[in-house]
A protein has these predicted regions:
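Negatively charged, low-complexity tracts enriched in Asp/Glu with abundant Ser/Thr
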Residues: 1-47
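Short, low-complexity, polar/charged sequence segments that are solvent-exposed and flexible
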Residues: 22-26, 65-68, 88-92
Length: 108
């Protein structure tokens, strides 16, 4: 799990909207691939998956105050699509953050 502080409180709906608008287009641009990810609000977290290629989720993001608790599926840590998604997510979290400030609280 990785915990990031974005120094700003956001709702799951705000996070979901940003990811739905920008994640797939950014992925297509970076990987030159037509893979489309499913981004869903699952009540207590936002989940990113791609059921045609991967069993289960790729990322789960839970919001706790100003922190984002990010769980990455242990089955796909070395997968190139998962690594690309992580890079894009980090950029989008900067966009979401207060003044672009993202602080790593925990990575493990």
């Amino acid at each position: 799990m990785k915990i990031l502080n974005i120094h700003k409180t956001v709702s799951a709906d705000q996070l979901l909207k940003l990811l739905q608008q920008k994640l797939n287009p950014s992925f297509k641009q970076q990987r030159q691939s037509d893979v489309i990810f499913t981004i869903e609000n699952k009540r207590s977290f936002v989940e990113i998956s791609q059921p045609d290629l991967y069993e289960g989720f790729l990322f789960r993001i839970e919001i706790k105050g100003t922190e984002l608790l990010i769980t990455r599926s242990e089955h796909y840590v070395d997968d190139v699509n998962s690594l690309t998604l992580e890079s894009i997510l980090n950029s989008l979290f900067e966009e979401l953050a207060d003044d672009g400030r993202v602080t790593l609280v925990l990575e493990g």
